[in-house]
Amino acid sequence: MMITKQSYQKFALMRVFVFSLSAFIFNTTEFVPVALLSDIAESFEMESATVGLMITAYAWVVSLGSLPLMLLSAKIERKRLLLFLFALFILSHILSALAWNFWVLLISRMGIAFAHSIFWSITASLVIRVAPRNKKQQALGLLALGSSLAMILGLPLGRIIGQILDWRSTFGVIGGVATLIMLLMWKLLPYLPSRNAGTLASVPILMKRPLLMGIYLLVIMVISGHFTTYSYIEPFILQISQFSPDITTLMLFVFGLAGVVGSFLFGRLYAKNSRKFIAFAMILVICSQLLLFVFKNLEWVVFLQIFLWGVGITSLTISLQMRVLQLAPDATDVASAIFSGSYNVGIGSGALFGSIVIHQLGLGYIGFVGGALGLLALFWLRFITIKFKKT
């Protein structure tokens, strides 16, 4: 009997690991343009701020597609659906690696965005479902760890490959790694019938939960502020701080490493006082952005800011996702789809705001504007915390 239990635990952990790897590759490809922005812009003879709008387009496709695509796929067995999504993901990366102009690259990114739309709508609930008993919160933390490792390994390695070969090779390698993950998924995941996915009728029910709606708005606000700055952090470090390309790569690595710390802190502290934990994470993100330009030439201070920023944004993202699942246990996939859509509205809006700031004020101002948006989000958090104190 003990062997059976140990075997169950082993396979359950391996399945969680597969989802963590999947999160790693999806987050790597979503944000790797941030690390390659200057190279892509140079190859197409475009400005970084213009190429950065590719991040906006990707995010808005995800935000618009998450809920309708999730509803269309609500009754599809989840393992089959995941394998289809990875096939689309891989084919789109092949096109990215072959992109002969910016528009072909943009089209390939839209294919990836469609896969992303459904993947993040169903993954949080699935990883909790396949996790060992009494390890549900830790499983969500491991999923977030995969996302953090994308920042630690995915983005710096993507940048290194782009520097040694070219940015197209980075997308080709991502497609190759995704193929290996797809094979692991096919081998390890069990049959996963759709459960508690919700339907179109779930949407108005969720809309009547004011705290849930308040959290979705909070997500849009705080992520808009974050990506106003983060979308252009690579050119900021190179051009404003005037640090070397190697230091820039190392700073991206530190940002991702900080995400692991954020995941660990979530697992240890979130359950003790979720409201204070969310507020503290937001303050870390806001202060890091507001002070970015002030200490732009002090290398060790910028490293510290990047680290605290990474800790804050990872802690915040997992916490808000957990809160959404807690408030909508009857329609987890629909709630997650709206969360993913809201998050990507924030990404797209932030990248757009950052582009406008660069054109109107200059690259050096992105931290001030991003931090100001974060302050508005902090006031909104305070408002909903007081209004729904007992929820």
Task: Please state what every model-predicted region is.
Residues R15-V51, S66-L69, T229-E234:
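Extracytoplasmic
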Residues E45, E77, L98-V104, A115, ...:
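Helix-breaking motifs and short loop linkers at transmembrane-helix boundaries and internal kinks
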Residues L64-W103:
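Conserved MFS/SLC helix-loop-helix module at the cytosolic interface between two early adjacent transmembrane helices
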Residues S66-E77, G262-S274, I358:
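Helix-to-loop junctions at the C-terminal end of transmembrane segments
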Residues S92-L95, W103-G111, W300-L308:
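Paired small-residue
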Residues V104, R133-K135, L142-L189, Y232, ...:
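Helix-loop-helix hairpin linking two adjacent transmembrane segments in secondary transporters
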Residues S108-G146:
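Cytoplasmic helix-loop-helix junction between adjacent transmembrane helices
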Residues K276-L320:
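C-terminal transmembrane helical hairpin of 12-TM major facilitator-type secondary transporters
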